[in-house]
């Protein structure tokens, strides 16, 4: 599979997608890092599969390596986790000439990337995403953040990695639920940018067929995202389209205190619900929400939810970063593969 490059001038970086890459991390790191110390941040689940393997191969290449394992789950991506990471970095005497590796899913990538961006005003880092969601979405584009009690990603920055290493083989150790979680983001790309890709995903009959095409799928998603990021790095226009389903999805995650739905499951619900609302308002072609519902059902993803206190959800939506001066930009579809921004307000969802 051809390597991709996110073209951002001096901050450009490659995305390498290759089966078996997890066993060649040291070779790729040597191409971008000439220092001595490497700090690996992971969680206990991922660490049990790949932590010692990667640490050992880096040590054999002459690096001084420290591995830190955190508890898995969204609760770890909290502001309060940062001092724990900073203290480990200080104990290891990491300097700005050293390297941080984030080995894990979106939580570790976001959390570790934000720690890298803020420690000593910035330490280089490399993303090694191990979940499908992180491989197709969160590892690319330089958005790093932590959560606050009142919402997701409320403290963050734009800080790009030096390199993204994607090994589709690591998905074999991913649970079925989190594989489906990632497929929600895959489906999103078809919804917003590529009708042909959407129907290709619909044509796949089962997980075996998906896995037989997984490199192609990951490559397509990363290609779409890298093109969008190159055109709108700081999320002021086109890049907002990548948030299709996320405004409502983030609110649903927060409403259930990040315990009932995974990120992808919440986004799946958000994509269907906002399309249904938009159809009723004449802003989306009729039948689009049904197409989305069908593909979500096909991939065993939820598409609707009962909310007892809608005011709480609306309060969370009001905190969305796309809500500026009480003008909320929501991402809608005209049709499958054709997305746009609609200026409205929080009442759009009521």
From Swiss-Prot:
Subcellular location(s) of the protein: Cytoplasm
Primary location recorded for the protein, binned into one broad class: cytoplasm
Residues at which NAD(+) binds: 106-110, 130-131, 143, 152
One Pfam family it belongs to: DHQS_C
Residues annotated to bind Zn(2+): 185, 246, 263
Molecular function per GO: 3-dehydroquinate synthase activity; metal ion binding; nucleotide binding
Keyword flag Nucleotide-binding: yes
Domain of life: Bacteria
Catalyzed reaction equations: 7-phospho-2-dehydro-3-deoxy-D-arabino-heptonate = 3-dehydroquinate + phosphate
Cofactor note: Binds 1 divalent metal cation per subunit. Can use either Co(2+) or Zn(2+).
GO BP term, example: amino acid biosynthetic process
EC nos: 4.2.3.4
Protein's pathway: Metabolic intermediate biosynthesis; chorismate biosynthesis; chorismate from D-erythrose 4-phosphate and phosphoenolpyruvate: step 2/7
Assigned protein family: Belongs to the sugar phosphate cyclases superfamily. Dehydroquinate synthase family.
NCBIfam families: aroB (TIGR01357)
Job of this protein: Catalyzes the conversion of 3-deoxy-D-arabino-heptulosonate 7-phosphate (DAHP) to dehydroquinate (DHQ).
Entry protein name: 3-dehydroquinate synthase
Organism this protein belongs to: Clostridium beijerinckii (strain ATCC 51743 / NCIMB 8052) (Clostridium acetobutylicum)
Classification lineage: Bacteria, Bacillati, Bacillota, Clostridia, Eubacteriales
Gene name of the record: aroB
């Amino acid at each position: 599979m051809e390597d991709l490059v996110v073209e951002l001038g001096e901050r450009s970086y490659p995305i390498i997608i290759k089966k078996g890459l997890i066993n060649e991390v040291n070779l790729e790191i040597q191409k971008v890092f000439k220092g001595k110390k490497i700090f690996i941040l992971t969680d206990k689940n991922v660490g049990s599969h790949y932590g010692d393997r990667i640490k050992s191969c880096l040590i054999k290449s002459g690096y001084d390596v420290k591995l830190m394992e955190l508890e898995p789950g969204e609760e770890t991506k909290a502001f309060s986790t940062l001092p724990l990471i900073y203290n480990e970095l200080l104990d290891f005497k990491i300097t700005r000439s050293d390297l941080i590796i984030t080995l894990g899913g979106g939580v570790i990538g976001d959390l570790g990337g934000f720690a890298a961006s803020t420690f000593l005003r910035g330490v280089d880092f490399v993303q090694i995403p191990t979940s499908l969601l992180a491989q197709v979405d969160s590892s690319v584009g330089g958005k790093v953040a932590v959560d606050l009690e009142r919402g997701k990603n409320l403290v963050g920055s734009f800080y790009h990695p030096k390199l993204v290493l994607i090994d589709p083989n690591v998905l074999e150790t991913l649970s079925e639920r989190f594989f489906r979680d990632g497929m929600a983001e895959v489906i999103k790309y078809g919804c917003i940018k590529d009708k042909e890709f959407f129907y290709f995903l619909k044509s796949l009959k089962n997980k075996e067929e998906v896995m037989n095409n997984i490199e192609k799928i990951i490559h397509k998603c990363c290609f779409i995202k890298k093109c969008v990021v190159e055109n709108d790095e700081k999320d002021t226009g086109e890049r907002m389209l990548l948030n299709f389903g996320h405004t409502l999805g983030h609110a649903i995650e927060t409403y259930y205190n990040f315990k009932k739905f995974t990120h992808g499951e919440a986004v799946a619900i958000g994509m269907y619900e906002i399309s249904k609302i938009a159809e009723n308002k004449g802003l989306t072609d009729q039948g689009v929400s049904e197409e989305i519902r069908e593909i979500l059902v096909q991939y065993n993803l939820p598409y609707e939810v009962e909310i007892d206190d809608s005011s709480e959800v609306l309060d969370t939506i009001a905190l969305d970063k796309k809500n500026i001066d009480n003008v909320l930009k929501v991402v809608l579809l005209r049709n499958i593969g054709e997305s746009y921004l609609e200026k409205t307000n929080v009442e759009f969802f009521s």
